[in-house]
Design a protein with these regions (language model features):
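Glycine-rich and small/hydrophobic secondary-structure elements
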Residues: 323-335
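Extended, charged amphipathic alpha-helical segments
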Residues: 192-324, 363-368
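Extended amphipathic alpha-helical segments with heptad-repeat/coiled-coil character used for oligomerization
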Residues: 338, 353-370
C-alpha cells in the first residue's frame, strides 16, 4: 500500500534517481509523519505534555500540571504478543546459535519494531555492522523509491542527523540493478552529495532496511491517550477547585481580596461572598476516562480490567490492572514470518561481506507466543 512517503519514478537511471531523492525529502513534513511522531511520543512516553497542553489555556496550566497516562505502550504490548517470548530461529534444521551470537539484542529490537509498526502502521528496520556483529535501528521516517509498475522498492532514504551548521543529513541506499551496483551515499537538505566511500557504492548490493506495513495505524489508541490526558487534567482541576468558584457581589471591581485559611475577609455592608460548586462529579468524570480507554480496547480486540477495590471517587478506581488480549494473534504470524526471512537475508549478506562467513540457507522461525 502506497503512502505519502513513497516515490514512483517513470524509469530507472542514476540521474533520475539522484534528482528524485534530493527533491523527495522536501515533502517529508506531511500529516502522516506528524501523526507517526505523535504516536511514537506516546509509545516512548516522551514529550507527551505538549500534546495535552495545547488544549488548555496558559492560565489554567498555572493551576495544575497536565496529567497524561502511560497507556499506549501497555496497549501495544497487550495487542502484539508474537515477540513476548523469544522466537525459535533455525538454520538448516538446527538452532541458529551462531547467527544469534552475530546479532545484538535482536529479540528486544524486534519486539519494539513489532509494537511500533502496529501503532504507526509502517516502520523501517535497519541492519548495520557494529562491533563485530549486526546491530539494529528503528527508522520511523523514510522515503521508499519505486520504478513505475514494480511493487518492490529499489531504494530508501532517511534522515540520520544534522551537521555542524544544523543542516539535515540524509542517507540513500539502493539495490544492485541491471548489472549496475547499488548506491550508498549521504546528502544534505540542499541536495549536496556527501561521499561515504569510493564511487558511493552499496557494498551489500541490497537495501539494508526491511519494512512491515499494516493496512491502518492504531490512531484510535493515540487519540484515546490524548483524551484521557485531557480528562485527567480536568479531574485534577476539579479536585483543586473542589470547594467551588469564589463569587462576590456588592463589591467595587477595583477592590482587592486575598483568600486563605489564615485571613479574615471583611465585607462592606450589603456585600456577599460564597463558593459556587462544580455541577459535575468526580465519579462521573472518572467513568468518562474509563470509557475512552475501554472503547479503544474494544476496537483492538482487547479488554481492560480495572481495580475495583477502592472507592469509586478515589484514584484507585482508575488504576488499570490488566489488558487482556481477547483474540489470538495467529493472523499476524505470516506477516512477521515474511519479515523475519527478509531481515535474515539482509543480516546474512552483511555478515558475509564483513566476515566472509555464510550463515547458511533454509532459515526458519517458530513463534512461541501468539
Amino acid at each position: 500500500m502506497m503512502s505519502v512517503n513513497d516515490v514512483v519514478l517513470p524509469s530507472y537511471s542514476e540521474d533520475i534517481v539522484l534528482d528524485s531523492i534530493r527533491r523527495a525529502q522536501k515533502g517529508l513534513e506531511e500529516k502522516e509523519n506528524a501523526e507517526r511522531a505523535t504516536a511514537l511520543d506516546f509509545y516512548y512516553h516522551k514529550n507527551v505534555d505538549t500534546h495535552i497542553e495545547q488544549w488548555f489555556s496558559t492560565s489554567t496550566l498555572q493551576q495544575v500540571p497536565v496529567f497524561p497516562q502511560k497507556i499506549v505502550p501497555r496497549f501495544a504490548r497487550a495487542r502484539n504478543m508474537i515477540y513476548k517470548n523469544s522466537p525459535k530461529r533455525m538454520i538448516n534444521g538446527e538452532q541458529a546459535d551462531d547467527y544469534k551470537d552475530m546479532t545484538h539484542h535482536l529479540d528486544t529490537r524486534a519486539r519494539e519494531f513489532n509494537e511500533t509498526s502496529w501503532l504507526t502502521g509502517q516502520m523501517g528496520f535497519r541492519s548495520r555492522w557494529g562491533k563485530e556483529r549486526v546491530e539494529y535501528d528503528l527508522i520511523p521516517f523514510f522515503k521508499k523509491y519505486y520504478v513505475q509498475g514494480e511493487s518492490e522498492p529499489f531504494g530508501v532514504s532517511y534522515e540520520v542527523g544534522r551537521d555542524h551548521k544544523n543542516n539535515r543529513i540524509y542517507v540513500f541506499w539502493s539495490r544492485a540493478r541491471d548489472g549496475a551496483p547499488g548506491i550508498h551515499m549521504k546528502f544534505d537538505q540542499a541536495g549536496r552529495t556527501i561521499q561515504v566511500n569510493d564511487d558511493n557504492v552499496n557494498p551489500y548490493g541490497i537495501i539494508p532496511v526491511t519494512f512491515v506495513d499494516y493496512t491502518t495505524s492504531a490512531s484510535d489508541v493515540i487519540r484515546a491517550a490524548i483524551q484521557i490526558g485531557i480528562a485527567n487534567t480536568e479531574i485534577a482541576l476539579a479536585e483543586r477547585f473542589s470547594f467551588g468558584q469564589p463569587v462576590a457581589t456588592g463589591i467595587e471591581e477595583a477592590t482587592k481580596m486575598k483568600l486563605g485559611i489564615d485571613r479574615v475577609l471583611l465585607l462592606p455592608e450589603g456585600a456577599t461572598f460564597s463558593f459556587v460548586g462544580n455541577p459535575g462529579s468526580l465519579k462521573d468524570m472518572m467513568e468518562v476516562v474509563k470509557g475512552f480507554a475501554n472503547q479503544a480496547a474494544v476496537n483492538n480486540h482487547l479488554r481492560i480490567r480495572w481495580d475495583e477495590s477502592g472507592n469509586p471517587p478515589s484514584g484507585t478506581a482508575l488504576r488499570l490492572l490488566e489488558i487482556e488480549n481477547l483474540e489470538s494473534r495467529i493472523s499476524d504470524i505470516p506477516k512477521w514470518k515474511d519479515w523475519e526471512h527478509e531481515r535474515y537475508e539482509v543480516d546474512r549478506e552483511i555478515i558475509r561481506v564483513h566476515t566472509n562467513k555464510d550463515m547458511g540457507e533454509n532459515y526458519a522461525v517458530d513463534f512461541a507466543e501468539v
